[in-house]
Amino acid sequence: ARSLALAALCGMSFAASAVTVDLRHEFIDGGKSDKSNADRVSVSHRFANGFGFSVEAKWKSGGDNTSQPYSDFVGNGHEESITWQWKANKNFSVTPGFNIESNDSRSIYKPNLRVQYSFDNGFYVAARYRYDYTRYPANAGKDDDKVNRGDAWAGFVLGDWRTELNYVYARSSEGVSRNDNKPYSQEYNVKVAYKLDN
């Protein structure tokens, strides 16, 4: 079975003094006994020279019923990123980046490269390759994991509104199970955003 993630059921992005705040809710359907809800908030900024950064806090539903949204919040780690966006022209950009995600039990290092083409009518397409290297410093007996991940996006901007579809395919090169005892996983994400401040 594939994993279905629906991000931003009630998410929004807005700009305030050139800073973007992104709120997301995520539901992951991993089968009959593996459903989870998670939330995140990130703050990001991109400077005129193309350099950008973001800081993200995460939490999830805990306790006896993780499939219940907003139930017994527990920490779910944090993530920081730096990127540099190079624009070949007004439509095409290339963005290398590096993310670090960590929680109490693991750290994930995520070098990545994204390309995007934006059409003049508001439609855009993008793709990203990311290599996720996971280490478990709190558990010396657990092997590291290495994952090759590909993302594809298609989106549309209309005024202050933006909608986006995202497909993710990730495969462990170490044979670590991701979904249904398979070394790969798939996600389908939907995002709707509204700009509150011009």
Residues of each region from the PLM?
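Cleavable N-terminal export/targeting peptides
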Residues: 1-20
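Short glycine/proline- and aromatic-enriched beta-strand/turn motifs that initiate or cap beta-hairpins
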Residues: 16-67
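Repeated loop/turn-to-beta-strand initiation elements of outer-membrane beta-barrel proteins
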Residues: 19-22, 49-55, 87-96, 121-127, ...
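Transmembrane beta-strands of outer-membrane beta-barrel pores
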Residues: 25-31, 57-63, 98-104, 129-135, ...
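Extracellular loop and loop/strand-boundary signature of outer-membrane beta-barrel proteins
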Residues: 27-29, 66-70, 100, 112, ...
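Residues that define the transmembrane beta-barrel architecture of outer-membrane proteins
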Residues: 35-39, 43, 74-80, 107-111, ...
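Residues on the lipid-exposed face of transmembrane beta-strands in outer-membrane beta-barrel proteins
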Residues: 41-45, 80-86, 113-117, 129, ...
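Outer membrane beta-barrel transmembrane domains
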Residues: 162-198
